[in-house]
């Protein structure tokens, strides 16, 4: 794995773990194992990225396959597979490693947590070369804002103002 992808994955894992920890602390879930699952999924979400840069393919699909093959853990693999895009309507309850990793990945610009607006502005500059790509980036931005709004309510914390310090969500303000 390229070192910059490893640093990015550690950043995503920290946020995903903090979201899961918050869910346990607030009673949004009665499944404390979500903390370890979210940490693992965050660390592994881009496990195949270096491979696909060199050889092609979907890093999410290949990575999920590797996770199932090496760990047998389908919950972690599901988060790896869907971290790029959740193609269905959102369920009411987003307290799950899939949504923790999706959200954390969308907040992580390289190896730092930034707001969704900052992250998507960066994506537009770097990848918004055509009307089609700009439209896709905008759809992802809107989807991520919905996830942020729902998770903020479910975790009773204003995520748009948050970062992670010492494994805990804290306000950036």
Question: Where are the predicted features?
Answer:
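Divalent metal-dependent phosphate-bond-processing catalytic cores, especially two-metal-ion Mg2+/Mn2+ enzymes
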Residues: 1-30, 44, 72-74, 85-173
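His-Asp-centered metal-binding catalytic motifs of divalent-metal-dependent phosphohydrolases/nucleases
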Residues: 12, 31-67, 79-87
